[in-house]
Amino acid sequence: MDIKDKSLKELEELSSQIRERIIDVVSRKGGHFSSTLGAVELTLGMHYVFDAYSDPFIFDVSHQCYPHKLLTSRWDEFETIRQFGGLSGFTKPKESPADYFVAGHSSTSISLAVGAAKSIKLKKENKVPIVMIGDGSMSAGMVYEALNELGDLKLPVVIILNDNEMSIAKPIGAISKYLSKILAGKYYQSFKSKVDKFIRKNMPEGTTYLAKRFEEAFKLITPGILFEEMGIDYIGPIDGHDLKEVIETLQIAKAMQKPVIVHAHTIKGKGYKIAEGQHEEWHGVGPFNIEDGEFIKKEAPKSATAVFSDALLNLACKYENVVGVTAAMPSGTGINKLMDEFPERFWDVAIAEQHAITSMAAMAKEGFKPFITIYSTFLQRGFDQIIHDVCLMNLPVVFAMDRAGIVGNDGETHQGAFDISFLRFIPNMVLFAPRDNETLEQSLEFAYNLNNPCAIRYPRGAFKKLNFVPTPFVLGKAEILKTGISNKLFIGYGAGVSRAIDTEALHNEDITVVDLRFVKPLDKNLLLELSKKYNDWYIFSDSQKQSGVGSAILEFLNDEKIHNVQLTSFEYNDKFIEHGDTKLVEQSLGLLPEQLVQKIK
């Protein structure tokens, strides 16, 4: 949609139409809501001043990219947002050349812009990268690594700091407080402009040195001093919902031909009163009633997250040395209950996974028992810290990995597929997974008493109810759930246990089912005994096949020179998994029990 010839009035009408479209579709389909409503005028300004098909448009995380999708030939297709086979909820170059880069994890945008700007300079192209980044993403260290180089190179990059004073959760830390202070002094920029005019008008040519020194001294009260001292110009704060001001400011920033931060104040949920000013409830939503804002809730069993949260709270009440941390996901990981109950022992450190892990390593060294509550996909962001600061020291840190396996509508950037693969080869690390609510509760007590670093994984949503009385967790010990007479053996890990049980129920043979429990260390004694009885082994796990559960067992069979076992692993193949309803995604991968039973002859 070309909007460059539209009048201001037409643009304002379009902003209303965009909001209406987002509210209508998201109310029926679900999706990221309040952040994207707050970014409508900023997005229109970007499209008016820049060219989305030429200038690199880079949306950090891209929770706020829905208006951009609607402006780039996806208005009708927007009905399919986050649905299986439909539009992604994030920017995705496969969808449109207007989507410069895949996004989903935070704080990558400015680094991408630096790389794009370097390339533009080398290729002698007339383009300017334009970034939209939220105040929540500004808490991550990668942002300042990028700003550090950008300020040094003086490359032309325009960065819109979309400051709604809310990330997904309540904003945390000194950076957030700094930005809030800037907003509190929002009239600074006009004051500075008046002083600049006074200097130019009243100081003769020979006093430019004095004028320069005055300007340097003036920076001491500049709200953007943090950025200006890094060599990046700062404009703002501006009203991010005033289209005229947004467009004029972006035109100025583009013409400056150097790095510029445009600090825009916006309201999260703008245009839908019920959502305005809400931190978490309206960030990512399911279907809701537009008239009253009531969510259309389906009856659902207690989620694994809720079970974990209650169990960790009980553990914290029992043991005073239990502490915990999350990286900007207190509600998503369930640690919010503990932050309310024990604010001196549980922290949200904002989007700072590396810091979260290393700081908890120090607490473990001091005798505390840290629980790092984190989504599987975000644990990737602290990989070096896991090795260098936790496992090398063999410190008893517990990584509680939520959203392990397929996560549904968030898609390929958020699937919890890789944690087993990248944790399994680290010395000292213990990996285990509960199969249901009862074993999840048990696993936390076990983790507390373990003197090694360990990682527990559990899925998004609820475990399937299983009718097995759990035995106590013992390090490196599996559990036989059912003994059959077939020469086949089903081994499940974590949520994969229920898939093994369901597949066995559909099969015409009486098959033994084992809950592996530990992928590291393996129960080698039991596996050795099982290899004497069963020749065809089938592995069920919600994880990547490469270096996954099947690989661990194959390594064991090879090391023990066991050659009579034929092993088949039902894990994720070597490709990224698309978004959509979990059952539809599993069906596309051939992982439903009714599909698996056809593969087991």
Curated annotation (Swiss-Prot):
Concerning PROSITE patterns, the annotation shows: TRANSKETOLASE_1, TRANSKETOLASE_2
Cofactor annotation: Mg(2+); thiamine diphosphate
Q: Where does Mg(2+) bind?
A: D135, N164
GO cellular component term, pick one = cytosol
Question: So what does this thing catalyse?
Answer: D-glyceraldehyde 3-phosphate + pyruvate + H(+) = 1-deoxy-D-xylulose 5-phosphate + CO2
Keywords on record: Isoprene biosynthesis, Magnesium, Metal-binding, Thiamine biosynthesis, Thiamine pyrophosphate, Transferase
Is the keyword Nucleotide-binding assigned to this protein?
A: no
According to its UniProt record, what is one Pfam family this protein matches? DXP_synthase_N
Gene3D superfamilies, per this entry?
3.40.50.920, 3.40.50.970
Keyword field contains Transferase = yes
Q: How does it assemble?
A: Homodimer.
Instruction: Describe the family membership recorded for this protein in Swiss-Prot or TrEMBL.
Output: Belongs to the transketolase family. DXPS subfamily.
PANTHER family found in the cross-reference section: 1-D-DEOXYXYLULOSE 5-PHOSPHATE SYNTHASE-RELATED, 1-DEOXY-D-XYLULOSE-5-PHOSPHATE SYNTHASE, CHLOROPLASTIC
Q: What does this protein do?
A: Catalyzes the acyloin condensation reaction between C atoms 2 and 3 of pyruvate and glyceraldehyde 3-phosphate to yield 1-deoxy-D-xylulose-5-phosphate (DXP).
Name this polypeptide is given:
1-deoxy-D-xylulose-5-phosphate synthase
**Organism listed in the record:** Aliarcobacter butzleri (strain RM4018)
